[in-house]
Amino acid sequence: YALEYDRLAVMDKWLLSKMNSMVKTVDSNLDNYMIPEAARALQEFVDDMSNWYVRRSRDRFWAKGMEQDKINAYMTLYTALVTVAKAAAPMIPFMTEQIYQNLVRKIDPAALESVHLCDFPEVNESWIDAKLESDMDEVLKTVVMGRAARNTANIKNRQPIAQMYVKADHELSRFYVEIIEDELNVKQVTFTDDRSEEHTSELQSLAYLVCRL
């Protein structure tokens, strides 16, 4: 199987964009001997990959058969994991070597014998989409605030909510709104800059959620 960028889902393109941005940051930090900053960039990417991409892609990973969408999800994750191993190799040599042997050498015995013989990952600028990264960051912020609002109101996530207002001076596309609605178990998310008494009373009487970006 091969990674075919033009056939990837938005979540796949987001992860690859974040991956290339991470490689760019880590490479720059290592060149300037900024080791803690390089490690932090790697950690943040792994957190995003584990806590967001993998969780949002579970249905694709476990889908029956080997449809193209499932292959795309697997290949995107595989590419990200191998890239992380290569980028982190100077800092955590033994762990990344084990990852490389399990992910690469077991599949391709003709591959280089060690991760430490591999070149540092090259940045693919064409895969970096700043707008996509920014929009997904807004989704993540909204989800975090929505969960906090639920906790404050003592409303568990399994209990559906009719409406959530997001205080913001802009709106996200329907694709991202649907992700928020799914993550927070909300029937309708509305972006608004209106903080009128009408919305306040609705919040108090119907236990609506209000978040602010």
Where would I find each of the regions flagged by the language model?
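Hydrophobic alpha-helical segments, chiefly the membrane-spanning helices
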Residues: 203-204, 209-213
